[in-house]
């Protein structure tokens, strides 16, 4: 399910507080010159009165007017450009000049989209900077292509985004065509806006299974895409910036708190130019995600072994993304889609270096992680785990010691253990090398502010303590102020003489070396065996170990190998009085859950559903109502130790069907013979088979299958279009278990019989009507055939196995020596009696 990620104080953090009241203003402190810095605290804001519309009326179509003459063909862009621009009731005069330090051609990246053309002799891809209305505090940062303008304007505390309108007509003077001018919308202070929910179902695991409950190296081959707004904003520094952000995201995935060896690898970097070749990037985050997901699939190769294949794709954009009700959204992704070529994708609104955590957050969703405050995380996380980890719904500060919550670690582990990460097992051949230095060494505090709040922003140095939160300059109603998004300074940012930031703390540079030396992890000892999942009938118990001797540090290799082991327990038979099977008990537990099925007349009678359930879904609790026949997956997993199917001795373990012998021992090779004797040789039963041809209208008795019969098979063949014969089953008490009272069951179903035995029925409309089951039957069963017309070329055959009668042991005939011995014994007895009579 798509979702919207909201991060704290988006409206205030961007520096614009349009219509947000009340606000708290702290005493001013002096800064350079006569400017004042107003410290605004996000926590002081109450919900604003802004409407809930996802797109307030903050955009209009404008026609920029070029004032300094025409550009002559072949002469390139003039040294200075003047544009007049109407903007929300004001007139803006843009004074622009070429920025010689920005050249997109210097990027060793793939360029897609409409190639820049020499329109009117203008130099394609020219980056311009300048001021607005002569205000030295204003900033204009634009990409200029033959009159088309794309970029950001910051003027008197307002941020404006301008871009060409696709298909827009030129103005009457033949100047630039229509442009969209969008004022970055203020947002409410209502807190989290990310409403991601657990998807109703999981993607199907690949038949290419990984070793169960094992820690295996996973390589997330990633396509990184930047749109034209990113190119306009970052210019020549785009590649380095993107790789720096991805390096920080990869570092988060290397942290041992995720409890899996996951390597985020950039294999391809694409920059989109203006045009219609790329995805449609607009204010709607959901539509942008859908468009990007569809577009990126065309760039991928289906073969996972192909060097050009990627496992997931991320789009970075400077577009202000909006969700359902506000424009707080910083990213969007689908849940649990990492190996789905059509849906393994995410979008991220560039927000400075902290976008690394947004990217990690979105990839966490792709790995099936939910928000730390979700219902599914209750009981897994501690009371403070909903706000200090990567998957927090509102990210203020990520704990560097534990960036991933226990819930996130559990979800990604279960996701990978259940076979959904099959595409991540191949190691990439030619990944792009990510920066290994701390990002703060390349981007100082001033540059971090510019990346987050715009080109005119600078670091506010007067606010202690350093490193904990990055405060940056801005403007509000013409007044200078400081603003923050509560993100710490980037690691490696200088914070004093011979000092630099690390994890939000200011440390001496000598201490940083300890954070730059990788340390591989090692397995700790196996833990004790846990409780058995069943008291009888064959349960499962677990033992696990952790990567704690030592714990990996600084991106060191996480432990590989088996992390969980399991074994069978309590394999003895359950008491004969048990009326329900283990799976039947689990279905019956929902009989009175009327809250889940409010449209059904309650209570319901839920029984297991086997027919029509795919093998990969055998370990889901699929139940159907006995009366209505509707069936649902009531639980994504049955209890450990539940048989995978009535005809199988294999059992479910953590949602996976694991082989077990007929002795209920996991890994055992013992099998039932045709007599359903565990480990038998088939000699204790005999086969009975026959056919039936004496058809007359109504119900006809075919054969009585005795109690104890096994491997029952009944088949009648004939064209369904002319068939007039149908199978039926009658119980000893005269009631029907199948197709009684001239009522047929057309579709496949399981016929549940006394003694927890079931037969699989093909349905009356099947091409070959069949009944089959392993048995043994607990009581006799009468097989009947219902004749509803004139049978033509009908054939009905049946077979089953019945126990052989146990021979009564005969008394062995005595040998001659035995007779002589017994004769002498008898004579001796008679002699003694004779002597006793004489006395």
From Swiss-Prot:
Entry note: cofactor: Binds 1 zinc ion per subunit.
Induction per the UniProt record: By interleukin-1.
Positions bound to Zn(2+): 194, 361, 365, 371
Keyword rRNA processing recorded: no
Cofactor: Zn(2+)
Annotated coiled-coil segments of the chain: none
Pfam families assigned to the protein according to its UniProt record, in alphabetical order: ADAMTS_CR_2 (PF17771), ADAMTS_CR_3 (PF19236), ADAMTS_spacer1 (PF05986), Reprolysin (PF01421), TSP_1 (PF00090)
Motif segment (Cysteine switch): 192-199
Limits of the Disintegrin domain: 437-519
Single GO term (MF): metalloendopeptidase activity
PANTHER family per the UniProt record, alphabetical: A DISINTEGRIN AND METALLOPROTEINASE WITH THROMBOSPONDIN MOTIFS 4, ADAMTS A DISINTEGRIN AND METALLOPROTEASE WITH THROMBOSPONDIN MOTIFS PROTEASE
Protein name: A disintegrin and metalloproteinase with thrombospondin motifs 4
Lineage: Eukaryota, Metazoa, Chordata, Craniata, Vertebrata
């Amino acid at each position: 399910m798509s979702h919207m990620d909201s991060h704290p104080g988006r409206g205030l953090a961007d520096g614009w507080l349009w219509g947000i009241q009340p606000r708290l203003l702290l005493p001013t402190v002096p800064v350079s010159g006569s400017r004042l810095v107003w410290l605004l605290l996000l926590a002081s804001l109450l919900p604003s009165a802004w409407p809930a519309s996802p797109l307030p009326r903050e955009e209009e179509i404008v026609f920029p007017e070029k004032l300094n003459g025409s550009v002559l063909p072949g002469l390139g862009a003039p040294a200075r450009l003047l544009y007049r621009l109407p903007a929300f009731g004001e007139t803006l005069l843009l004074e622009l000049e070429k920025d010689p330090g920005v050249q997109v051609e210097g990027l060793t990246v793939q360029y897609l989209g409409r190639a820049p053309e020499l329109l009117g002799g203008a130099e394609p891809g020219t980056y311009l900077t300048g001021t607005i209305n002569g205000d030295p505090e204003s900033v204009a940062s634009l990409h200029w292509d033959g009159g088309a303008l794309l970029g950001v304007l910051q003027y008197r505390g307002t941020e404006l985004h301008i871009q060409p309108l696709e298909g827009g007509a030129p103005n009457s003077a033949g100047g630039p065509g229509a442009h969209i001018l969008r004022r970055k919308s203020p947002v409410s202070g209502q807190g989290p806006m990310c409403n991601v929910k657990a998807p109703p179902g999981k993607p199907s695991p690949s038949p290419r299974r990984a070793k169960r409950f094992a820690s295996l190296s996973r390589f997330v081959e990633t396509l990184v895409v930047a749109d034209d707004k990113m190119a306009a904003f970052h210019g020549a520094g785009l590649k380095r910036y993107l790789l720096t952000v991805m390096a920080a995201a990869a570092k988060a995935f290397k942290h041992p708190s995720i409890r899996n060896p996951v390597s985020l690898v950039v294999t391809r970097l694409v920059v989109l130019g203006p045009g219609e070749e790329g995805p449609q990037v607009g204010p709607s985050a959901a539509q942008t995600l859908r468009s990007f997901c569809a577009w990126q699939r065309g760039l991928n190769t289906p073969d996972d072994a192909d060097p050009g294949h990627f496992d997931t794709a991320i789009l970075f954009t400077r577009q202000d993304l909006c969700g359902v009700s506000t424009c707080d959204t910083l990213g969007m992704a689908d849940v649990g889609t990492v190996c789905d070529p059509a849906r393994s994708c995410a979008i991220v609104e560039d927000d400075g270096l902290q976008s690394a955590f947004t990217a990690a957050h979105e990839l966490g969703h792709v790995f099936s992680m939910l928000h730390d405050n979700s219902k599914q995380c209750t009981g897994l996380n501690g009371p403070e785990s909903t706000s200090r980890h990567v998957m927090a719904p509102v990210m203020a500060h990520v704990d560097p010691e534990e960036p991933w919550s226990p819930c996130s670690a559990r979800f990604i582990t279960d996701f990978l253990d259940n076979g959904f990460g099959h595409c991540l097992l191949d190691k990439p051949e030619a990944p792009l090398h990510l920066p290994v230095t701390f990002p703060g060494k390349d981007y100082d505090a001033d540059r971090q502010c510019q990346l987050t709040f715009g080109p005119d922003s600078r670091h506010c140095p007067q606010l202690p303590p350093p490193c904990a939160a990055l405060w940056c300059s801005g403007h509000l109603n013409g007044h200078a102020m400081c603003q923050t998004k509560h993100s710490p300074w980037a690691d490696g940012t200088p914070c004093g003489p011979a000092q630099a930031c690390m994890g939000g703390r200011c440390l001496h540079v000598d201490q940083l070396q300890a954070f730059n030396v990788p340390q591989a992890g090692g397995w700790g000892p196996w833990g004790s065996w846990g409780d058995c999942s069943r008291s009888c009938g064959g349960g499962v118990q677990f033992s696990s170990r952790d990567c704690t001797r030592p714990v990996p540090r600084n991106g060191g290799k996480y432990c590989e190998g088996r992390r969980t082991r399991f074994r069978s327990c309590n394999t003895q038979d359950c008491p004969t009085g048990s009326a329900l099977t283990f799976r039947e008990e689990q279905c019956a537990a929902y009989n009175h859950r009327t809250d889940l099925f409010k449209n059904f007349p309650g209570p319901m009678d839920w029984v297991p559903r086997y027919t029509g359930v795919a093998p990969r879904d055998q370990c889901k609790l699929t139940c159907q109502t006995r009366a209505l026949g509707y069936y649902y997956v009531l639980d994504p997993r049955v209890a450990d130790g539940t048989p995978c199917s009535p005809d199988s001795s294999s059992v479910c373990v953590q949602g996976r069907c694991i082989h077990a012998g007929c002795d209920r021992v996991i890994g055992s090779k013992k099998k039932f013979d045709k007599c359903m004797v565990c480990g038998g040789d088939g000699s204790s039963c005999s086969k009975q088979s026959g056919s039936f041809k004496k058809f007359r209208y109504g119900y006809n008795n075919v054969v009585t299958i005795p109690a104890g019969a096994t491997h029952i098979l009944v088949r009648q063949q004939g064209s369904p279009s002319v068939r007039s014969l149908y199978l039926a089953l009658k119980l000893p008490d005269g009631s029907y278990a199948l197709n009684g009272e001239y009522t047929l069951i057309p579709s496949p179903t399981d016929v549940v019989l006394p003694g927890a035995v079931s037969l699989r029925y093909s349905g009356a409309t099947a091409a070959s009507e069949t009944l089959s089951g392993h048995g043994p039957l607990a009581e006799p069963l009468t097989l009947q055939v219902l004749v509803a017309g004139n049978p033509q070329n009908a054939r009905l055959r049946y077979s089953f196995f019945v126990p052989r009668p146990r021979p009564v042991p005969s008394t062995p005939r005595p040998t001659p020596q035995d007779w002589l011995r017994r004769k002498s014994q008898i004579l001796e007895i008679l002699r003694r009696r004779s002597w006793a009579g004489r006395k």
